[in-house]
């Protein structure tokens, strides 16, 4: 029984009032089927994030239909103060878990009421560290399928320590806050383990060429460099290194998971990023089913499908163990899903770091065993 809670164009007060009235209706609608497992899908239905919200709904609803989950759809406006009304709808519908939550503004208001109702909130995208710190401090039931920023730097440092010892190493950021913090965490981890980079620099992003940077790397004798920058900037560095005949091993981070334009990435560039979900062995059958139904398994579709699978399994575990859902999730229980085994650590982040070393083959990224040129 889908319940669609969608604000119209009224002022904010009327939106909140109408949502609260609809939650009462939702409660009556679910009164006769309170024992059925249900999933709340909280995602934008209009506005700038409508396409992302559509991906969340398509993936979660496809899994729910297959698993027999009741569905409660709630619009996520991403406005400050909207979380309370969204929580009312989820609590009234007695959902087993709520997934989606693409906006931090929503989570700030939705989490306290969900704590009282023992309803886990599983965000597919929010990485805000302060929000998770508050969640752990106040016991809010927030769990992240999106990897933390620290997961990225931890994996990159691990790979550099494993594969680049004995080489002249460079670390380059693009001056943005995200990039500088990423590179700082990597450098700290390396130095704590006795590996000091030979070269560090801040590049100027969005330039037509990076020959000057490439020549500085060459003069310093750098053979391996990590570049914390957007994919196109890394592609320009790789192109210019090739034109200068510099055999440079280049590795980027999760920002490399982007469109291959305007400058195409040359083969052999490395990236530490999440694998394409539709390429995972565990996803092949479901990806085929989705394509057969006219749904391309891209973006949030497979993560949302996995979150629905997790919700169904969690509902069974709650009944079997007579424990609240958040307690089971925080206890490290692992669930099999379309994107692999998923579980959470005591910090409510994924227990298995999803970042993997990959190599660009000229068409797409593929798994790589070692961070070296081929």
Residue ranges of predicted features:
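Extracytosolic ligand-binding ectodomains
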Residues: 4, 8-12, 17, 22-25, ...
């Amino acid at each position: 029984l889908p319940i669609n809670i969608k604000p119209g164009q009224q002022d904010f007060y009327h939106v909140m009032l109408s949502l609260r009235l609809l939650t009462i209706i939702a409660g009556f609608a679910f009164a006769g089927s309170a024992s059925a497992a249900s999933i709340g899908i909280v995602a934008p239905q209009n506005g700038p994030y409508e396409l992302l919200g559509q991906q969340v709904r398509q993936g979660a609803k496809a899994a729910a239909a297959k698993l027999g989950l009741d569905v409660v759809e709630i619009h996520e406006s991403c406005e400050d103060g909207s979380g309370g009304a969204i929580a009312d709808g989820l609590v009234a519908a007695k959902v087993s878990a709520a997934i989606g939550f693409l906006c931090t503004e929503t989570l700030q208001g939705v989490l306290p009421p969900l704590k009282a109702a023992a309803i886990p909130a599983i965000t597919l995208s929010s990485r805000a560290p302060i929000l998770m710190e508050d969640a752990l401090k106040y016991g809010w039931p927030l769990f992240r399928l999106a990897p933390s920023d620290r997961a990225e730097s931890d994996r990159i440092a691990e790979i550099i320590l494993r594969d680049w010892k004995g080489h002249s190493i460079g670390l380059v950021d693009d001056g943005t806050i995200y990039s500088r913090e990423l590179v700082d965490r990597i450098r700290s981890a390396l130095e704590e383990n006795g590996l000091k980079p030979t070269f560090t620099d801040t590049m100027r992003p969005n330039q037509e060429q990076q020959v000057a940077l490439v020549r500085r790397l060459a003069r310093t004798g750098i053979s391996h460099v990590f570049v914390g920058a957007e994919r196109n900037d890394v592609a320009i560095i790789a192109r210019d290194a090739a034109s200068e005949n510099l055999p440079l091993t280049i590795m980027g981070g999760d920002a490399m998971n982007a469109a291959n334009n305007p400058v195409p990435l040359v083969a052999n560039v490395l990236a530490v990023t999440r694998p394409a979900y539709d390429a995972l062995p565990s996803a092949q059958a479901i990806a085929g089913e989705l394509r057969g139904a006219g749904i391309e398994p891209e973006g949030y579709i497979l993560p949302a499908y996995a979150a629905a699978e997790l919700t169904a399994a969690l509902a069974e575990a709650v009944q079997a163990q007579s424990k609240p859902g958040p307690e089971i999730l925080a206890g490290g229980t692992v669930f099999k899903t379309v994107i692999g085994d998923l579980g959470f650590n005591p910090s409510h982040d994924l227990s298995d770091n999803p970042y993997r070393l990959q190599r660009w083959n000229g068409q797409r990224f593929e798994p790589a065993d070692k961070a070296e040129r081929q």
